[in-house]
Every structure is written in C-alpha cells, then in structure tokens.
Amino acid sequence: MKFIDEARIEVMAGDGGNGSASFRREKFIPRGGPDGGDGGRGGSIYALADRNLNTLVDYRFTRMHRAQRGENGGNKDCYGKGGEDIVLRMPVGTVITDLETGELVADLDEDGKQAIVARGGKGGLGNLHFKSSVNRAPRKRTMGEEGERRALRLELKVLADVGLLGMPNAGKSTFIRAVSAAKPKVADYPFTTLAPNLGVVRTDQNRSFVIADIPGLIEGAAEGHGLGHQFLRHLQRTRVLLHLVDLAPFDPDADPVRDAKAIVEELRKYDESLYNKPRWLALNKLDLIPEDERAARVAAFLEAYGPVERHFEISALTGDGCRKLVFAIQDFLDAGRAQAEAEKAARTHAEALAAAEAEARVEAAYQARLQALLAEGETGTGDDGRDGNENDPADEQDTNRPNH
C-alpha cells in the first residue's frame, strides 16, 4: 500500500432536527395542550487511532465526510431520532489541525484514543417547553442548531523511540536490517529508501524499542531539496537520534565531516527542538577500512567534527559493534522511561495535593458562611423574618399549644 503521511479533509457534522409545534387532538378535548417534541441531535464526527493502519491514503481520495442530520420532533411529545455519528479511523501518530485557525484539534498518539473533530448540532425545542400559566397554547418552537464544519489537515508522525539520520547511502537501511526484523530495500545507489521504515529492536524477552529509518538527507533538505525533508516530521516524536556517517565513501571527493555537519545544520534549520534532541554518532562501514587504519580514521574524524555526546564504531553489514550500540540505546531509553514515570508520579501527587487544598478551601468557606448565617439567626436578622424578640406572641402561641 502506498505510504501517504499527509492529507486534507472536510468534516461536516449533522444539523440538529427542528422542534415541533403541535397540539393534542383527543376525543372530547377540542383544545388540547401543546405536545410538540424536540428535534434529534445531529451526528458528530470522531477520529479514532487504529494501530492496524499505517497510511492516510484513504483520506487522500475521500475528502468530504458528512454526518447524518437529526430528525425533526413530532406530535405526542415524540422526540426526533438523533443522527448517526461517524468514526474516522486513522493511524496511531496522526496529528489533526484546523486549517483555518491552526488550532490543534487532536493528537492520536495512543492506540484506541478517540477525539471529536466536529460536534453535531443540538436539536430544537418543541412547543411543549414554552407552556406557562399565561400562555397555555404556545406556538413557539426552536430550530435545530447547525453542526460544526471544519477543514482539517491530517499529518502522520510515526511513533518511534530512535530516529536514523544520515546522507543517502550511509547504510541506514542496512543497519535497521541488521538489528531488527524489518527488511527495507538495500542497494548501492542513493535514495533507495523512499518512505519511512520502522523496525522493532528486541534486546531481550522483555525489552525492546522502535527505530525509524527515513530517506537520506542532503544539503538544502530544510528548503525542500531531496526526499528527506518530507519525512523529517517523523523524527519529532523520537527520544534519541542516531546519526550514521559513512567513513569509507566510494566518492574520493566526499568529505564525511562536511556531510555530517551538513545534516546537523539541516536539523537546526528545520526545527530547533529536533536539533536539540540527544544525538549520537554511529561511524559506519569500518569493514571497508583496513584494520590498521581504523583508529586513525576515527580519531581524525572526531577531531575535525568536534564535541559529540556519544559515538560508536560499527559495521552494519557485518554487525560489528551493533550489539553494543543497541544495548546502549536500550539502557538510555529505559532510564528515560523511569525518569518520566517518576515525574508523572510526582505530578500526580502534586495535583492531588492541590485538589485537596482547593477542596479544603471550599469547605472552610462553606463553614464560615454557615457560622455567619447561624450568627444572624441568633441576633434576629435571619431569613425567617423574626426580629429576635423572645416575647414574640407568635412564639407564646406556639408554646401554649396542647400536645396531641
């Protein structure tokens, strides 16, 4: 199936049904009262994250989605039937924004997460609601509300823990094949990868992470050159970036240091938050370098490249160094998850304390108000209309009543 990660659609929720203005018609009751029912609500439109989907191709060709209108109210206090809701299933990781306002409508970042994208209109009121002691036969009713109408942008950002960076032909697809069960196309020409590939790396029975391979970047990618710029968004949800560098390029004019710095610069131009993510270097294709030259080649690269958070020396083709790398990534991710869970627990505890304090303040205000009311009653300024005189005749009359 073709990989589509962006689409634009229009959603139109159903209008509410109109209320009814009708009157009872019964035998021997020539002028019955109002009995008009309310209109049904219009159908709403929901977006649902479905892990079984991995592309937005369905929404590229079906752009208009309209929910059912609510039925009108009837006589005998019959309410109109509500319009049926529509559920639009989308891949996990889909971000929905309003094209007109730029508002974030929903971020479907978990399987089964559901969000309303267009709310159906409320049904109108029947004339039964407008009956009063003054107007016993109202002819007034209200029309149903219009449902929401929106133009939406759907943007798929794949959910992965690790994102692979690198120039075309840096060995990213070979690496993901070596460490996971994913089988992307591998060839000895640039831009072999035309769409993101996901692979699950399992370090043991209970530990794993997801790695994303996007098409190679070239200089000017942030301005739209090459293919990689179309898919940089898929790296925004990752927790660490793995930058693969070809230390043994076939082109004698190629400069690994210049190419690596160009990739980093493209990240900075595209998104500052992406640029600031943890970024590790994987110096690849060491199997093509004579063993006695490897240490010098690596040292020369690191000296010219500058400071780096962490670096690893690997050969994706032979697997050398890959095991050490994936276990280091797993440990880093596990530590991050533990820290995130601790922060979440602390946040939950703080929210619970804040809620308890707010509840205590409300209770204190209530008790203060209650004491004030009691004090007013004792001084005769209460709401019962008495002036606090103990010799009130009404009180004496009450106390002199015989007990039954």
Curated annotation (Swiss-Prot):
GO MF entry, a single one: GTPase activity
GO term, biological process aspect, one: ribosome biogenesis
Alphabetically list the UniProt keywords: Cytoplasm, GTP-binding, Hydrolase, Magnesium, Metal-binding, Nucleotide-binding
* Pfam families, A to Z: GTP1_OBG, MMR_HSR1
Which segments constitute the OBG-type G domain?
160-334
UniProt binding sites for Mg(2+): S173, T193
The annotated region (Disordered) lies at: 22-43, 373-404
* Enzyme's top EC category: hydrolase
Binding locations of GTP: 166-173, 191-195, 213-216, 284-287, 315-317
Q: Where is this protein found?
A: Cytoplasm
Q: Which cofactor does it need?
A: Mg(2+)
Per its UniProt record, what CDD domains does this chain match? Answer: Obg
Question: GO CC annotation: what is one?
Answer: cytoplasm
Indicate, by first and last residue, each region the UniProt record lists as having compositional bias (Gly residues). Answer: 33-43
InterPro entries in UniProt: G_OBG, GTP-bd, GTP-bd_Obg/CgtA, GTP1-OBG_CS, GTP1_OBG_dom, GTP1_OBG_dom_sf, OBG_GTPase, P-loop_NTPase
Q: Which residues form the Obg domain?
A: 1-159
Q: What is its EC number?
A: 3.6.5.-
Query: What does the subunit section of this Swiss-Prot or TrEMBL entry state?
Result: Monomer.
Sequence similarity? Belongs to the TRAFAC class OBG-HflX-like GTPase superfamily. OBG GTPase family.
Task: Give a short account of what the protein does.
Answer: An essential GTPase which binds GTP, GDP and possibly (p)ppGpp with moderate affinity, with high nucleotide exchange rates and a fairly low GTP hydrolysis rate. Plays a role in control of the cell cycle, stress response, ribosome biogenesis and in those bacteria that undergo differentiation, in morphogenesis control.
Q: What is this protein called?
A: GTPase Obg
